[in-house]
Every structure is written in C-alpha cells, then in structure tokens.
Amino acid sequence: MARSRPGRTPKVAGIAAAAAIACALSGVRTLEAQGNGRNAHWYMGNYSNEVLVWDEATEKVVDRIPVKRPISLRLDVSEDRSRLYVMDPFFETIEIIALPSKESIGEFTLSEGSTRTWIRSFQVHPSQEWMAMFVQSRTKLADRYRIDEPTILRFDLATYEVTDTIPWPDEETRRSANFRFSPDGDLLYMFTDDLIALDSETFEEVDRWDITEPLEPGLGEMRLPFGQSPYQEEDGVYTGLFRMTDPLQNRRLMGIATVDLAGQDVEFHPIGPSEGVSFVLSPDGTKGYGLKSEIGHYEMWKFDLLDRRVAGRIAFAGRPRMALMPSADGTKLYIYNAGSTIDIYDEETFEFLRTVTLDADMTSVVVVPDPG
C-alpha cells in the first residue's frame, strides 16, 4: 500500500493494490550502494571519563577516548561520521569529539548561575556549523523554582552562542519535539503532532504533513517509523515497523513501512497482529531485526523486507533491558546494553555463539560503519 500527501500522485493507490507492491520495497539497496564497509566501530558511553571504541572484526576494545565529564549518557554521530557528540548525565553539557582523531575539540552548556538549561533534543545541520536544540530552563529563586516554557534555539557551533530562537509553528508550544534536516540542509523537519518542514534559514513553514491522519479511507491512525539506523538505506528515507488500528475489527495491526520525507510518500504493508517488537535495519537493507521483551519472556525476530513477512522468531535467554544490532558484514546479531556484555548470535540460525565481556557498563552506544 502507498499513501502520498494531498496533491501528489500516490505510487500505488488503494488497499487492493497491496499485493502489487509486495516485492517493491522502496529503498532496498545493497551494502556497497550505501557506502558502508564490512566492519564497524562501536562508540560506547559508560560511567567513567572515557568513551570505549569497540571493533566488530576483532571483538576487542581498540581505543579509549578521554572525555571531560563522567557518565556519557547520550552519544550521537554527525551525518558524515566526522564528529561525535557526547551528552553529560544532566542533559546540560555537550562535548564534541573529532573522528577519526578521537580528540576533543570543545564543549558547551547553556546553564549559567542559578539557571539550569536542559537540552532535551538536538540535531546538527549537515554543514556542522550549527544545531537546532529543544531546551527548557529552570531557575532557582529565593523561595521557589521557575520553570520556563520549552524553546527551540539555533546554536552556532563555531562561537558556541545562541544566534536565533526558532518560533513554534502556529505559536503553539509543544512539550516535546525532535528534528531531522533534509540531506541538503535546506529544510528542518520538526516532528510534533504533524511533520512540519521549516526553511532552515528563515525558519518559516514551507510545508506540513499530517502524519496522524489515516493513510487510507477506513484505516485508523497510524504511527510512522522515523528511527535512524547506522545502515539507513538513503538520506531522508526511513524503514521500520508501524502500528495501526483496524476500526472494522477493533484490533491493532503491525506492519512494515518505508517513509520518504521529501516526497511525503509512504509504502506500507500489514504483516499481522501488533506485538511489542523493536526494529533495526540490516546492512544491505533487505532484512530487519527486532526484540520482543516481556517479563520472563524474550524473543528475537527477523523480517524479510522483500516479501514483507516475518522470516523467523525464536525465544532466547534475554535480559530486561537490551538492544539488538546486526554486524556490518550481516553474519551476526549482537545483544547489548544495560551491562558490560555483548552476546553474539548467528544471523541465519539465531544460534548463540559467545559472549564478549567489557570492563565497563554501557550507558549509550552509537555504531559507525567503516567506509566502503
């Protein structure tokens, strides 16, 4: 199935056309076409003043990057993989690490005096000259705390100064917001109730996509996937699981969707009843993997993105907090997070292979594939 915004011609129209696109998933590309090699390095935040660098090929920690503050709670990598952004545990300070030299090139905070400013979310412009930041401040007064309204800022990464305040669309303050830039940096996409495209220079609204509307007549509300993957098939295109309500049967469904931000197009295909499964894309874009986690019961899932189906699922000895990542060469699956171990499984059979034990507990992980 496919759905475009009003005024655009859908790639495929109507529910009855679902079978016609079963083997035409947008964005399925080979590993070589994505520019990724067959190895990757993991940058791991932990409770020390270091970021660990773990190499998939050797399964060893190959470097340690000193950082100024302990407990790197969140790590992000720039689109060109040349910068690592390290967030402190108080959501107040960001340190910038140059890759591959692994040297700190600066840090900044918006907190000052009795005012603490929390950085709730941010996105760096492709030029790496500035970032959009969603922040909120708290000021300690003599008899109380004053909590300011959430604000979106334009922050200059050369001067470390706020250079503009980005107005809220419709002058309506939101309690949460996430961002993406278009590949050319001309548009700033804001994810709120709607998907709003702003001119990245003037911050004027240039387009809007009501992503809460049903994609087809008779279908219920559908939550679209916008999660980023180290093996994202192309800029501005996101593949993942969606969930929707079937109003006729009064049930929740789950399926696979590919979303094109620039074209405002969606290709989707329901695959069965909704279950609480995560999703991550394979390096070649033809498969997806997920985890189902319930108290005392854990499953690994595999999705065939060409035939739009569940290709396999197996119960295994998981952990209450965990994440899954495929290896860059596509032969292994890693179970990690919330601890100091990485469990390695065979991608084809789900067979457990071995456990790698680190000397630190992970707080955040970002995977950076080597260039192809």
PLM features per residue range, with description:
Residues 34-63:
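An edge-strand/N-cap motif at the start of beta-rich repeat modules
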Residues 338-372:
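Blade-level signature of beta-propeller repeat domains, shared across WD40, Kelch, NHL, RCC1
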Residues 70-77, 115-124, 173-180, 215-232, ...:
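Repeated scaffold domains used in trafficking and secretory/extracellular systems
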Residues 65-95, 99-123:
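Blade-loop segments of beta-propeller domains
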Residues 60-66, 103-112, 161-169, 204-209, ...:
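A short beta-strand motif characteristic of beta-propeller blades
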Residues 91-93, 137-142, 195-196, 244-249, ...:
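Short glycine/acidic-enriched loop and turn motifs that connect beta-strands
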Residues 133-149, 236-251:
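Short, conserved, GDST-rich strand-edge loop motifs in beta-rich repeat architectures
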